């Protein structure tokens, strides 16, 4: 039988003509990749996979409950004969519907739309319906069994959070017009969750690759004699199945131990050879052969391995000393059962019963079959395969010990996976479902069997017990816990008073602009470990850019300061995250391939002696082949056809260990690359003919030679078709022009950095490229916003990726229908004159400002900018700032309305109630500090006084900045409680102290608003909008901004928009010619006049348009935070922190250093102590106890000393006094010792 080979043949590469293809045309390939998957399509696809496959698979397959417990009921004679009861149930149907909401006024359920959930503080969750089969079996002492069965019809158990835009969302497949009608942004892709009215994003989370051995040297610590360890997490399937971990350790004593981590297995380091003996392989030679493969080989590596293994077998272990030399597998299994089994409380009690011992042994083996390397199989007939695989793992660890191979690179994406929202929520769902649903059902049945005789049970009793167990608190527990896992961000959440590790990493979605929203959805977080927070070499290495990042992780975007540097990353622009593929069909295809010998047909000796390569699929060892390179290449060609092998299949040949790996698991990063074809076969034949002709003495032997050619089949016409929308990425994949490559397979590729590099080596046979890349693909969306980023210092590009997410703009198009807290909506936004490819996917967030690079007075130092007052008056960076006020009616006694002063007490002094109409200030009204904006009163229960029926609980506006009431709503909450919701609007023009930034990360602060009459101007009368200090560029090396200004100047004069995407070629000569055509100097500098004196400047000034963005850091919001007054804590009197509570600013280290350097220590004391919670306390000198002081009536009194008291005033702090009160409440007295009085002579 011939191996399966590709059927499609491609035309000769010599016939491909793409000389007209430019670097700018290659950008269309990025557009095709983004248009195919969408910037966040992987996130929605991951959640859809969870809904369609994950939740049904978890509930149906992982929660088949089968427990037996001793019957405690003894009311009748039949009860006394009943020994035990077996409870079995499994779920037969799982269905998750679209979100619904109970309409309390009509008493029915209606569809819950996303905006309704936002306004009403609801959670966008869909009902979870389950159906089940229950079997109850009673076992009697006389051997009789009695069975009761019941089918549970589908009913709602709880609700599950639904992702906006998924196939369970009401906006799924809606047109833009339909989205507008329901108050949604028509261009919004979704990908986030709405929980309790807030929007939350589940981050992509890094994880190690399962079914892969990760080998690491272990740091020698006190009490730990471990040298090296290999960790292996085995997972059958590829997405939602349970996993099991084993840890193989090599100790300083020479021992090799295996630790199995499972809930059904106690943690214990078992000598490795006992695992082999327990599964029936008792001979030492047979055991060692599974590791070294060939005992007869005399190679130095083989000899050294045998020495290590023989020594490890004879190393004594105190715990396993009784079975160290035991060859009887039954005794070994029984000994392990006593040590590590969890399913029997006292295994040693069964030693006298042979039947019980046999049952325990078989049960132990059955458990081991399921938890030991389950990806290799979970039945008894797969034990030999597992032992061979376990031997291979130990073999690889020994190779690392001998320095033949290096340990695993922890930071390489070759051995990592990125798990999306589907996998993260599945992990949380497993633990929460077990605690909140399964446990109550079991307890419900136990309670039923305790109260009702088994023979009296009916199908109705069983159904009612099943439903009652879930109708109490389970529904709310499951829903509340899933919401808590998304909202809290805590590492541990409580479910039914049980702590559960939270596997979900989330962040609140702050809609500052569209770029910020997309960046939040493309965030990749690394697990926060103890190593990450330490100042160690490991903490530094895990934050660096790894060689496997380019093309998959943006090499520029991360946090610029703090612990998240290098730990919070972004996907590159073309990177995508794969869901799990169909493993079974590919496995069957590989096993039927004649080139692959199945594992059972290959002996260990043949692997070494015949030089066979191992073949794996999702980490499962399925067989061997003779030519690994040919096998990998053949299946890659089949993948290009897309009929037999899925296009997203990873095919990797590890040449160091000669293994071929096929991966279809979830979480693989992938990106499209253009394929490079060549004529190597023709070239080799021609060279062979030329060599033969030369041997025969043919003088014209060189005529047989042909040039080597390598090229891509991508042409400029295809680039035009992509931009026209007639050609897609799927078409390119189907035509064999591009394919998807993962970080593993990238190690088998030689990728040309650009089309220019490919052409440079077009005829170089020593550098045969497999693919050609687009240079811009190494950056993410936020980094691609920066023009000519390759000319700017990388650190500045990193700053821009963070500043670009803070800029003001249009945060969404549905803003009139939303009520958001602290949102800025900028009025005028322009497309930049020098745009980048990123602007095809995000709306603009800035203005083309005329910038003069000069020193003009003392107000524009490096970090400050002079702004033209005329620019501010024309609406430059002007916008609207929104706040919300939300008030809930806490009980039936509260109501909205204008308080009547005749029957309401506790009215706020000095407050203005006149603007209230039906409890709310009307829309369009200007409110100022002291105005009541929401009127609320509460009826006093039991009050008989007609003049004091109500108490005032109104909300007063407390800001100095006037506001306009923009919207007023009265939505109903989840329990039909009424809210008062008000949106306030503020005009936010550019003020002194506000921040702005260019797209090159050059940030500046508005230091002076200069009148138009004082601004400098050119000979043509052009005045700059901003004056930037030229010294800010040499130190920051923002060359990209200089190029942007020069190109923007030419574009403005010629009325065109050009592309300034990073890595595009820059023709300086052509740029100078464009400026000369418009009558300017070749470098763009112009002669300018001083606006204050009217004189010429001695030097030419560089002036031109630069795209600037206003950052959402407003001085008006921070003004109250630096004052000596503001809200304080009611107990300690200290200032509150945080903007939400209108608290003060944190005094940072740099501010502290500045004040210390200036000798202003008293200022620090004043701000940190006196203005914080400073107070005067009165203490008696005689006894040291606090004294009583009344200022209005000059009373000085000590409760201990009475008239003999000697009272002194002491500078103290409110927090100190609170602490003393708490200690006295705990019956611990604190006395103060004051210094003696010093009397100075008159």
UniProtKB/Swiss-Prot annotation:
GO terms for cellular component: DNA-directed RNA polymerase complex; host cell cytoplasm; virion component. InterPro entries: DNA-dir_RNA_pol_su2, DNA-dir_RNAP_su2_dom, DNA-dir_RNAP_su2_hyb_sf, RNA_pol_bsu_CS, RNA_pol_bsu_protrusion, RNA_pol_Rpb2_2, RNA_pol_Rpb2_2_sf, RNA_pol_Rpb2_3. One of its GO terms (molecular function) is zinc ion binding. This is DNA-directed RNA polymerase RPB2 homolog. The binding of ribonucleoside triphosphate to the RNA polymerase transcribing complex probably involves a two-step mechanism. The initial binding seems to occur at the entry (E) site and involves a magnesium ion coordinated by three conserved aspartate residues of the two largest RNA Pol subunits. It is found in: Host cytoplasm; Virion. A zinc finger (C4-type) spans 1180-1201. Part of the viral DNA-directed RNA polymerase that consists of 8 polII-like subunits (RPB1, RPB2, RPB3, RPB5, RPB6, RPB7, RPB9, RPB10), a capping enzyme and a termination factor. Catalytic component of the DNA-directed RNA polymerase (RNAP) that catalyzes the transcription in the cytoplasm of viral DNA into RNA using the four ribonucleoside triphosphates as substrates. Forms the polymerase active center together with RPB1. Part of the core element with the central large cleft, the clamp element that moves to open and close the cleft and the jaws that are thought to grab the incoming DNA template. Coiled coil: none annotated. Gene3D superfamilies: 2.40.50.150, 3.90.1100.10, DNA-directed RNA polymerase, subunit 2, domain 6, RNA polymerase alpha subunit dimerisation domain, RNA polymerase Rpb2, domain 2. It comes from the Viruses. Induction: Expressed in the late phase of the viral replicative cycle. The keyword Transferase applies. Keywords: DNA-directed RNA polymerase, Host cytoplasm, Late protein, Metal-binding, Nucleotidyltransferase, Transcription, Transferase, Viral transcription, Virion, Zinc, Zinc-finger. Its EC number is 2.7.7.6. Belongs to the RNA polymerase beta chain family. It comes from African swine fever virus (isolate Tick/Malawi/Lil 20-1/1983).
